[in-house]
């Protein structure tokens, strides 16, 4: 493989952007393991007092990721996130106002490999969410196992991440006077295995849990499509039925999360590495679908609302696709 090295005279701003994204990729892939290593080092060093205090803290704080988390605006305002946003860049696009007197479920599509658009828009304060949607607070739900990792869980909660459990979503949406948004990556880990450049496959036909929660809480549904999310990385070919895909799906069932074999560019060269490509991400927030609170919705009501959501998502995509580089003949594929 011939390596294409980055030029030496790159502007400082671009170097800072690369550094910001590198620390984010590192945090996503290795920070949790490092935190576990720190915890084990405390055990080996027999620092029992520190361990006892932290274990007590874990016991008292264990349910916090399912109770709205513990965001810290200072962390969400770190300058590193501005450079992170500018690397791609990431842009949040509003199609209509959202009434802060309601609670909402935003369905985020597609998952992509590392969900960069969801993190940049809803876990930092640099893409204008507060200005576009005043009076609303976003909560991005991620897999619960991240919050079982010592030390890492505190960092994750600081940026507004919460657990992707039914209890957690219900807690966010139970705010009496409205103003909360649960952002759920509907396709989940399974969808990340289809996150190839140009792919428009969404795993959504069997995903109806968010519909049931919307009925229970009376939360309005908002489809969100992030154009460019699947263009950030290449993946090793893994078509359905291939040996690699079978192994990945098996590991996902065992561990609860997927392991896409991805690559893109490096820090000092453009040919290979785990850094994402500099590709623009446009996250478009659609119009809300009103939902009447219903404690025990019938199967017909669930199916009807699910179909309404699919139709709204498809309409959102069709309305904006050509503006963001999708050919006219391309359409979403629901599986």
Curated annotation (Swiss-Prot):
Residue spans crossing the bilayer: 24-44, 47-67
Domain of life: Eukaryota
Any one of the GO CC terms: endoplasmic reticulum membrane
Keyword Lipid metabolism carried by entry: yes
Glycosylation site list: 77, 125, 180
Keywords on record: Acyltransferase, Endoplasmic reticulum, Glycerol metabolism, Glycoprotein, Lipid biosynthesis, Lipid metabolism, Membrane, Transferase, Transmembrane, Transmembrane helix
InterPro entries given in the database record: DAGAT
Gene Ontology terms describing biological process: glycerol metabolic process; triglyceride biosynthetic process
Topology of the protein relative to the lipid bilayer: Multi-pass membrane protein
Subcellular location per the Swiss-Prot or TrEMBL entry: Endoplasmic reticulum membrane
EC code(s) of this entry: 2.3.1.22
GO molecular function: 2-acylglycerol O-acyltransferase activity
UniProt catalytic activity: a 2-acylglycerol + an acyl-CoA = a 1,2-diacylglycerol + CoA; a 2-acylglycerol + an acyl-CoA = a 1,2-diacyl-sn-glycerol + CoA; a 2-acylglycerol + an acyl-CoA = a 2,3-diacyl-sn-glycerol + CoA; a 1-acylglycerol + an acyl-CoA = a 1,2-diacylglycerol + CoA
Pathway(s) this gene product operates in, as recorded in its UniProt entry: Glycerolipid metabolism; triacylglycerol biosynthesis
Family: Belongs to the diacylglycerol acyltransferase family.
Functional summary from the UniProt entry: Involved in glycerolipid synthesis and lipid metabolism. Catalyzes the formation of diacylglycerol, the precursor of triacylglycerol, by transferring the acyl chain of a fatty acyl-CoA to a monoacylglycerol, mainly at the sn-1 or sn-3 positions. It uses both sn-2-monoacylglycerol (2-acylglycerol) and sn-1-monoacylglycerol (1-acyl-sn-glycerol) equally well as substrates, and uses sn-3-monoacylglycerol (3-acyl-sn-glycerol) with lower efficiency.
Record protein name field: 2-acylglycerol O-acyltransferase 1
Organism: Xenopus tropicalis (Western clawed frog)
């Amino acid at each position: 493989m011939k390596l294409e090295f980055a030029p030496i005279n790159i502007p400082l701003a671009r170097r800072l952007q690369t550094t910001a994204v590198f620390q984010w990729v590192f945090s996503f892939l290795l920070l949790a393991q490092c935190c576990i290593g720190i915890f084990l080092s405390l055990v080996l060093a027999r620092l029992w007092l520190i361990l006892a205090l932290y274990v007590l803290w874990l016991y008292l704080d264990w349910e916090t990721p399912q109770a709205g988390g513990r965001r810290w605006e200072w962390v969400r305002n770190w300058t590193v996130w501005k450079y992170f946003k500018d690397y791609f860049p990431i842009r949040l696009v509003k199609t209509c106002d959202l009434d802060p007197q309601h609670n909402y479920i935003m369905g985020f599509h597609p998952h992509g490999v590392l969900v960069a658009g969801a993190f940049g828009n809803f876990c930092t304060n640099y893409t204008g969410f507060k200005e576009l949607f005043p009076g609303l607070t976003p909560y991005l739900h991620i897999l619960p196992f991240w919050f079982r990792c010592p030390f890492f869980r505190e960092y994750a909660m600081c940026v507004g991440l919460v657990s992707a459990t039914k209890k957690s979503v219900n807690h966010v949406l139970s705010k009496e006077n409205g103003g909360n948004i649960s952002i759920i990556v509907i396709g989940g880990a399974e969808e990340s295995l289809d996150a190839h450049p140009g792919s428009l496959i969404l795993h959504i036909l069997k995903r109806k849990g968010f519909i049931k929660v919307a009925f229970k809480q009376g939360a309005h549904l908002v489809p969100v499509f992030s154009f460019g999310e699947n263009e950030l990385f290449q993946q090793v070919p893994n078509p359905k039925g291939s040996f690699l895909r079978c192994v990945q799906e098996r590991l996902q069932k065992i561990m609860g999360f997927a392991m896409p074999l991805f690559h893109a560019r490096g820090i000092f060269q453009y040919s290979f590495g785990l850094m994402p490509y500099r590709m623009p991400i446009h996250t478009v927030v659609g119009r809300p679908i009103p939902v009447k609170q219903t404690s025990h919705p019938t199967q017909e009501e669930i199916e009807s609302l699910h179909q309404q959501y699919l139709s709204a998502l498809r309409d959102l995509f069709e309305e904006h696709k050509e503006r963001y580089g999708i050919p006219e003949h391309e359409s979403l594929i629901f599986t």
